[in-house]
A protein has these predicted regions:
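Secretory targeting and sorting signals
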Residues: 1-28
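Conserved catalytic-core segment of clan PA serine endopeptidases
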Residues: 30-38, 85-132, 143
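N-terminal activation segment of mature serine protease catalytic domains
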Residues: 27-51
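Acidic glycine-/aspartate-rich tracts in secreted/extracellular proteins
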Residues: 49-51, 74-78, 89-94, 112, ...
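C-terminal subregion of chymotrypsin/trypsin-like serine protease catalytic domains
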Residues: 2-6, 23, 44, 62-76, ...
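A conserved glycine-rich beta-strand in the N-terminal activation segment of trypsin-fold
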Residues: 43, 49-66
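Beta-propeller and closely related beta-sheet repeat lectin domains
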Residues: 59-62, 206, 213-215
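Chymotrypsin/trypsin-fold serine protease catalytic domain
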Residues: 100-101, 117-203, 251-258
Length: 263
């Protein structure tokens, strides 16, 4: 059963926020810390077309090439490219003096998402080259960052507590730890799928509504920063014993979908 996504406000009449009540999508970052201007430059804000500041923000994303932004499939359900814009290079969404506001001309959703509600990954193609740097995907088969207790970070502009109607302008991040599949059994009632999803948590910290589609990332032994997950869903936000759930970038089908689409 999939009723737990962490998308933010409604888009084009689709009430994503209403769907996030109780068991629902990930909201803003709970706990954590504010991100300094210029840091995490691969972050993207997915917004309603024509909006300004935080008004239209409903999901996060990550720059994965000069033309493509990775986000969650549930963020793009029943959505046309003309209905959205992508903001990059802006840590504070109210500071419009920097960064880029980009139009989209193509949305690709993982082909298996509609049937399963898993494989929660989508890609947005923008019409203008992205100036911000891309984040590298975790190499296929590299599982060190999915081991129990591995240090990870999730970031975004989601709400700061479950049910809040307010999107913060300043990006936040929270450091979390990976939860091994065998230790994420409490999420079984939400339909957790170990083959295509991963879990992460920390006491008092989590992603939340408005963070859906944003990246879960960490550093490999050689120091490279890589994306290992896509914010997907959870039971409320920072609910004890119920880790946040993320689309698994290391899943062969998700990894191939991203790399074959981006080229």
């Amino acid at each position: 059963m999939r009723i737990l996504t962490r998308a933010g406000a409604a888009l084009a009449g689709a009430s994503l926020l209403a769907a996030s009540a109780g068991l629902g999508p990930a909201q803003a970052i709970v706990g954590g810390y504010q991100v300094e201007d210029g840091d995490l430059a691969f972050m993207a804000s997915i917004q309603t077309a024509g909006s300004e500041g935080t008004d239209g923000h409903f999901c996060g994303g990550s720059v994965v090439s000069s033309e493509w932004v990775l986000t969650a499939a549930h963020c793009m359900e029943d959505t046309k490219p003309s209905e959205i814009q992508v903001v990059v290079g802006r840590t504070n969404l109210d500071d419009t003096s920097g960064g880029q506001t980009l139009t989209a001309d193509r949305i690709e959703v993982h082909p298996d998402y509609a049937d399963t509600q898993t494989f929660d990954a989508a890609l947005i193609h923008v019409t203008t080259p992205i100036e911000s740097p891309a984040i590298e995907l975790v190499p296929l088969g590299e599982e060190s960052l999915e081991e129990d207790g591995a240090a990870l970070t999730v970031s975004g502009w989601g709400t700061e507590f479950f049910g809040s109607p307010f999107i913060p302008a300043q990006m936040k991040a929270v450091d979390v730890e990976a939860v091994a599949d065998e230790n994420c059994t409490t999420n079984a009632l939400m339909g957790f799928q170990a083959e295509s999803e991963i879990c992460a948590e920390t006491l008092g910290g989590d992603s939340c509504q408005g963070d859906s589609g944003g990246p879960l990332f960490g550093s490999l032994a050689d120091g490279r920063l890589v994306q290992v997950g896509i914010v997907s869903y959870g039971l409320g936000c920072a609910t004890p014993k119920f880790p946040g759930v993320y689309g698994e970038v290391n899943n062969p089908s998700i990894h191939d979908f991203i790399t074959s689409t981006v080229g």
